[in-house]
């Protein structure tokens, strides 16, 4: 039976800060330009029309509109922004 802790226990005990990854705006939600849509590691989702990608693969809205998720085949998932419908008042 050991009477000293050994070297293993003193080298443990670290943890990393949470990164808060995932989808931030879901399909059908109305967004403004600059809103973050998805925080991700790698390109789990790809940028579609009206969506930009940051250097850490974060997807964000380039224009105002509604979020649309599109699945194209196997493993190709795109996020696009559908332009907001402008309502005209009838006289």
UniProtKB/Swiss-Prot annotation:
Key words of the record? Ribonucleoprotein, Ribosomal protein, RNA-binding, rRNA-binding, tRNA-binding
Single GO biological process annotation from the record? translation
* Keyword hit for Ribosomal protein: yes
GO cellular component terms listed in the entry, alphabetical order: cytosolic large ribosomal subunit
Q: Does this UniProt record's set of keywords contain Ribonucleoprotein?
A: yes
Q: Pfam families per the record?
A: Ribosomal_L27
Q: Where are the transmembrane segments?
A: none
Q: Which InterPro entries match?
A: Ribosomal_bL27, Ribosomal_bL27_CS
Classify the source by domain of life.
Answer: Bacteria
Q: Which GO terms describe its molecular function?
A: rRNA binding; structural constituent of ribosome; tRNA binding
Q: List the disulfide bonds.
A: none
On subunit structure and binding partners, the annotation says:
Part of the 50S ribosomal subunit. Contacts protein L18.
Q: Do you know which NCBIfam families this protein is assigned to?
A: L27
Purpose of the protein = Binds the 5S and 23S rRNAs and also the tRNA in the P site.
- Which PANTHER family does the protein's record reference? LARGE RIBOSOMAL SUBUNIT PROTEIN BL27M (PTHR15893:SF0), RIBOSOMAL PROTEIN L27 (PTHR15893)
Which HAMAP family has this protein been placed in? Answer: Ribosomal_bL27
Concerning its family, UniProt says: Belongs to the bacterial ribosomal protein bL27 family.
Identification of the protein by name? Large ribosomal subunit protein bL27
Q: Which organism is it from?
A: Deinococcus radiodurans (strain ATCC 13939 / DSM 20539 / JCM 16871 / CCUG 27074 / LMG 4051 / NBRC 15346 / NCIMB 9279 / VKM B-1422 / R1)
UniProt lists the gene as rpmA
């Amino acid at each position: 039976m050991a009477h000293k802790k050994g070297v293993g226990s003193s080298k443990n005990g670290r943890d990393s800060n949470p990164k808060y990854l995932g989808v931030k705006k879901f399909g059908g939600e109305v967004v403004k330009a600059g809103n973050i849509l998805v925080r991700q590691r790698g390109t789990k989702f790809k940028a579609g029309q009206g969506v930009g990608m940051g250097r850490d693969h974060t997807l964000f809205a380039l224009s105002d509109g509604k979020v649309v998720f599109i699945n194209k085949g196997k493993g190709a998932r795109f996020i696009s922004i559908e332009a907001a419908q402008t309502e005209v008042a009838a006289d």
